């Protein structure tokens, strides 16, 4: 089961990477990119929207503060959050 969720997460990431970062400047694309990093890390989503989009199969982290992102991913997440605020995206 963990293998299936890993494969699904990899496919989502690959699809996200296919969109140039500069082009991912709308709220929906930023939401998907941001939450893809959380899915990859094993986060268990709580919102219905995220559960429907990503699912919770294979998740094992319930507290997002416990996620240990690599520095480059942490920086990208900070950039995404800044862009979401600038665009006034819903959270």
Tell me the role of every PLM-derived stretch.
Residues 1-6:
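Positively charged n-region of N-terminal signal peptides that target proteins for export
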Residues 7-8, 13-21:
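C-terminal segment of classical bacterial N-terminal signal peptides
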Residues 9, 41, 81-83:
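Enrichment for repetitive, rod-forming helical segments
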Residues 11-14, 28, 70:
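A general, composition-driven signal for non-globular sequence regions
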Residues 21-30:
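Cleaved targeting-peptide boundary
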Residues 29-55, 59:
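Amphipathic alpha-helical packing elements
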Residues 45, 52-91:
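Compact alpha-helical subdomains of small soluble proteins
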